[in-house]
Amino acid sequence: MAKASQRAPVLGPAFIRLLARFKDDATSPTAPDVSARLATWFDWNRAITLSRALDNPPAPAPDGATFDPDHDADCTRVRDRLLQAIHAEIAPVAPADAAAPDPYAPYRQHYQAQQRAMQTATGNLRGRLRDMLARQSPAKARLAEVDAVMEATLSPREHTLLSHVPALLCLHYQRLHDSAASADAQASATTTALFLQDLRTALLAELEVRFHPIEGLLAALRTR
């Protein structure tokens, strides 16, 4: 008896594996060479700026500020506000609108609105933490400068990559609803609920990705 083919596991972080499932990609991508990939993302100007941040003697810290627990509380407030928006109820597309030319449009708009909120909130928070880090010590001021260069260099790439997530979710939406096209209303509602759960899961995973630099800055702020 012939064995059923098994899908090769997709390597990488949970967010990447989730997106691969939405794409229904049966191949396991080769892990990229991170250093080679970063080299293509840095133009000469960025590379020189980063080199200066790493090589120049750090400037004296202005006031030697210590870690303030309010920074933790600020991060928690920002995260909680974004989580509340992600978990807010999403109105499913009405059955009468399911035959519209683009029934996925409300979900796309919702996801993109959440992305904009996350980008604004995490960007502002990252800047505030970096300013505080720069005031703690000369070494931490250098770290803050490096983080600023990395954000300026990588954020446009990150924005471009994350902008493709709604399109992958659209493929997932179409696949789910094509499979339920001949089902009854209850089965269709179940399919919609499953999709909305996956949409929230994607937003939660993206939020974690966006908070990685913030968590790194917080850890640096706590270090004496």
What are these regions (language model features)?
Residues 80-212:
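Extended, well-ordered protein cores
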Residues 220, 224:
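Inter-helical turn/loop segments and adjacent helix faces that build the functional surface
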Residues 1-108:
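N-terminal leader/presequence regions that precede the main folded/catalytic core
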